[in-house]
Design a protein with these regions (language model features):
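Catalytic cores of TIM-barrel enzymes
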Residues: 1-420
């Protein structure tokens, strides 16, 4: 792919990097070991910004990301604004699902914190399955954003028809609903500002020869249930107390989840979808529970995305070594499995010829180790996991916030020595 109308050295590098990634993803040997840059707050720290500044200063974060990409020279990057730059919008919404730096006493130096809570009670399962959009509008959004509580008063439109639609307009004149709608407009304007900076940065990095490696996000159905609806306690109890309801919800989610990712990728003119997983790790579910409540539904999501021409990059957080023989059941050369603590050598043995493997330089090594430690670990990964291709070098869950710059530089620089 050329950048602009003329062939430039940067456009040649862009095409080479893009091809290097695709060769690895599609299980061919690239010219050398490819890398992707993914982080939350490390790129901000690398430029002297704290976490609060990263979440509120769109232009400053763009400059930090630009510096990190230029210095590290990865073959692809995941845009950082889409991960952290939500501070002003969350302020407007009075958002409830996170605490973030400078908000309610959290230090400016601390990353945002996820708040585990129940946002859908057990007797609402059927309501969500029957009318997910209505549930999200009337119940979920008012629960996760204080400024949107009045949306619970909106008309129940499936039962409001013909002239009653006209009569229902009265609801929008209520002061509290007007305030909620004005808040949505204000929040939308703020997100437009952030997206504009992000889009400009992606284009600038493209001109410099660096492709984006994430064009949308998606989820596993069980993670949606546990992270965003029932909460961890509710989801764990439902594995035993509400099995049929939980399975019904996840079957519904297999059709609800993919369209958002497909739409995002189309808007970004890209084909890589990032999927962080939280509940598929060893030790949480038994093998039988995993093959009942997690994998079949998630596999359907993956296959739908693949059929749409997309390449899922699945971040398997924690240790998932015991799942390898199950999760290898996907079309060859269409998925990337990004491992944190899974045994990479067993993963290569199980997934060779089927899935591209990404990872997994440990966070602890990047934070407390030395560049020589990093280089030695990367060499082991390249020699074994990189054998025959199908491997992308990265940190275990992306570059950790506290990683030493010299260790991060060592990882990315060493990859350029790994020639096939």
């Amino acid at each position: 792919m050329s950048v602009g109308s003329a062939v430039t050295p940067e456009s040649v590098l862009y095409a080479q990097r893009q091809q290097r990634l695709m060769d690895a993803i599609e299980l061919r040997e690239p010219d050398r070991l490819p890398t992707i840059l993914f982080s939350h707050f490390w790129v901000a720290h690398y430029s002297g910004m704290n976490c609060r500044q990263a979440m509120y200063d769109y232009e400053g974060l763009a400059a930090a990301m630009r510096k990190a990409v230029v210095d590290l020279e990865p073959d692809g990057f995941q845009p950082v604004h889409a991960v952290v730059a939500f501070g002003p919008t969350m302020d407007i919404l009075d958002y409830k699902q996170l605490e973030w730096p400078g908000h309610k006493g959290l230090s400016d130096e601390m990353p945002f914190q996820y708040l585990d809570a129940e946002y859908m009670v057990p007797n609402e399962y059927e309501e969500y399955v029957l009318d997910p959009t209505g549930f999200m509008l009337h119940k979920y959004m008012p629960r996760v954003a204080g400024a949107l509580e009045p949306l619970s008063q909106l008309p129940m439109y499936p039962g409001v028809l013909h002239t009653r639609i006209i009569q229902s307009m009265e609801a929008y004149a209520r002061p509290e609903i007007r305030r909620a709608l004005e808040t949505l407009i204000k929040a939308g304007g703020e997100m437009q500002k952030m997206r504009a900076v992000q889009s400009r940065l992606i284009e600038e990095l493209k001109v410099l020869g660096f492709p984006s490696a994430a064009h949308g996000t998606s989820h596993a159905p069980f993670d949606v249930a546990a992270d965003y609806l029932r909460g961890s306690k509710g989801a764990m109890l439902d594995l035993f107390r509400n099995k049929d309801r939980l399975l019904s919800l996840m079957d519904r989610l297999t059709t609800l989840i993919p369209p958002a990712a497909i739409s995002a990728a189309k808007a970004a003119s890209g084909n890589m979808i990032f999927i962080p997983l939280h509940w598929g790790l060893d030790g949480f579910m038994s093998p039988k529970q995993f093959t009942t409540f997690f994998w079949p539904q998630f596999q359907k999501v993956l296959l739908t995305l693949i059929e749409a021409g997309l390449y899922p990059h699945v971040l398997w957080e924690g240790n998932c070594t015991s799942r390898l023989d199950v999760i290898k059941d996907v079309p060859p050369g269409k998925c990337v499995y990004f491992f944190e603590r899974t045994d990479m050598f067993k993963a290569k043995e199980a997934l060779r010829g089927t899935v591209c493997i990404r990872g997994n330089v440990p966070a602890s090594m990047l934070i407390t180790g030395a560049p020589s430690d990093v280089r030695e670990y990367c060499k082991k990964l390249f020699d074994v996991v990189g054998d025959g291709g199908g491997f992308i070098l990265d940190a275990g869950v992306g570059v950790p916030d506290e990683a030493k710059p010299e260790n991060v530089l060592a990882m990315y620089r060493y990859s350029k020595e790994c020639v096939y």
